[in-house]
UniProtKB/Swiss-Prot annotation:
CDD domains: AdoMet_MTases (cd02440). InterPro entries: MeTrfase_TrmA_AS, NA-bd_OB-fold, SAM-dependent_MTases_sf, TRAM_dom, U5_MeTrfase_fam. This is Uncharacterized RNA methyltransferase BL1394. Its EC number is 2.1.1.-. S-adenosyl-L-methionine binds at Q261, Y294, E318, D366. The keyword Acyltransferase does not apply. It comes from Bifidobacterium longum (strain NCC 2705). GO terms for biological process: rRNA base methylation.
């Protein structure tokens, strides 16, 4: 119901003065103009701001969008952007990649925890408080220097650039504050910031973080990749990632073009939490079946196969064939022969599971942003899994799938968010369901 006490907005051409009401999705907040919902970028709840509406905005539109051009009454969570180029367009910004750059680090945690809780309530039909963890080192770094992968596009002058939000315009950049210092060192050494690229070409840097004495110095020297339009320009096509979980170090061979958790600490944090949840459900059972769905290059597969029961049998399923080849290589390197690693659509693969793997004790799934969807959730339930560990990169998809799993008789036993995307609205969530 509209708030009758809400002050009527003051409008000037395509701008309006509004009071921001609450958090919304995609790093935006909600306000109202003439009774219509407006999703506002670079705002915070309770602020009084001047907003410029995006064009076109028609009277018949269900909602409008806009961006802060002036802050009249700031929130205590507002800060000066640490990366001004990613801030509001009216304040010299406009490139994407850091839509919460105007929010303090504690404010970002609050924003994300509330967003996950609200989505779980609205779409998952369950009220739950969601604790959120910051990654080690992020507070000291001010939320910067965490990305081990970055992507850019060459502008008309061949310089690395990022697109200005909502346009095809390219803004040349000569650094990327969210990137790790290791990545920035590689970019400087390989003369990336000096340009010379074909206009319009896609530029990708993938640079695993060194892992101390474990990394061989000679091998580490070329453990990076500079790719242009998918082709290797410098470094190595196959990269080595090392992840230490509960004292055990795992080596992963990962294609430079493939997916890997982008935050330097995310594989350790997520891997440790997932393994601990699974072991808590198996309770040291010597014989168990585990499914690892949407398994990528095997981030969870390797520790699941080695750190659970002695006779654990596993099925891993991933749609990207290159990632599956990487996972199979990683498994062979550790002599893990009891994992059936398959490439293919998850739902179709689950229709034809071998009998000895058909009844999982625990299912671990890490689906893409769209989520697992109802069919896969129901297939998991039909297989008789007593525990489900769901890793989600989108709280909306998690909430929808939560409703399906609860409808199949599961109960949400544990949920925790991980801030592995500082300065952005993105958040990773891990949920445990049992029945």
């Amino acid at each position: 119901m509209p708030n009758s006490n809400r002050a009527q907005p003051e409008r000037t051409m395509m701008q309006a003065e509004v009071r921001i009401e609450r958090y919304a999705d995609q790093g935006r907040c909600v306000a109202h103009i003439d009774g219509r919902v407006v999703f506002v970028r670079f705002a915070l709840p309770d602020e009084l701001v001047r907003v410029e509406l995006d064009e076109p905005h028609d009277r018949d539109d269900r909602f409008w969008t806009g961006e802060v051009v002036e802050v009249l009454e700031p929130s205590e969570d507002r800060v000066t952007p640490a990366w001004p180029l990613a801030g509001p367009l009216a304040m010299g910004g406009g490139v994407g990649g850091a839509d919460l750059v105007h929010v303090s680090l504690p404010g970002q945690l609050k924003w994300k925890a509330i967003t996950v809780s609200e989505q779980m309530s609205r779409l998952g039909h369950i009220d739950v408080a969601v604790p959120i963890e910051r990654m080690p080192g992020d507070k000291a770094a001010g939320g910067l220097n965490w990305r081990t992968r970055i992507e850019m596009i060459a502008d008309d002058n061949g310089m690395p650039s990022m697109r200005r939000r909502g346009t095809h315009n390219r803004v040349a950049i000569d650094t990327m504050p969210l990137a790790t210092r290791t990545l920035l060192d590689v970019a400087k050494r390989e003369h990336v910031w000096e340009g010379g690229f074909e206009p319009g070409s896609q530029i990708r840097l993938s640079v695993p973080e060194p892992r101390g004495e474990i990394v061989d110095t000679a091998a580490a020297d070329d453990n990076y990749a500079v790719l242009v339009d998918g082709e290797l320009r410098a470094g190595s096509q196959l990269l080595t990632e090392q992840v230490t979980i509960n004292g055990t170090t795992f080596d992963y061979q990962v294609d430079a073009n493939g997916f890997w958790q982008v935050h330097r600490q995310a594989p350790i944090a997520l891997g440790t939490h997932v393994i601990n949840l699974v072991n808590g459900q198996l309770q040291s059972a010597a014989d168990a079946v585990i499914w690892d769905l949407y398994s990528g290059s095997g981030l969870f597969t390797l520790p699941l196969a080695t750190m659970t029961g002695e006779r654990t049998r596993m099925l891993s399923v991933e749609g990207a064939r290159v990632a599956v080849k990487n996972a199979q290589r990683n498994l062979r390197a550790m002599n893990l022969n009891d994992v059936d690693a398959r490439a293919g659509d998850v739902s179709r693969t689950l229709d034809h599971v071998p009998a000895h793997l058909a009844k999982p004790n625990v299912v671990v799934l890490d689906p893409p942003r769209a989520g697992a969807r109802a069919k896969v959730c129901r297939q998991i339930a039909a297989a008789g899994a007593s525990s489900v560990v769901y890793i989600a990169c989108d709280p909306t998809s998690l909430a929808r799938d939560t409703a399906t799993l609860i409808g199949e008789g599961y109960e949400l036993k544990d949920i925790r968010a991980f801030d592995i995307y500082p300065m952005t609205h993105h958040v990773e969530t891990v949920a445990l369901f049992t029945r």
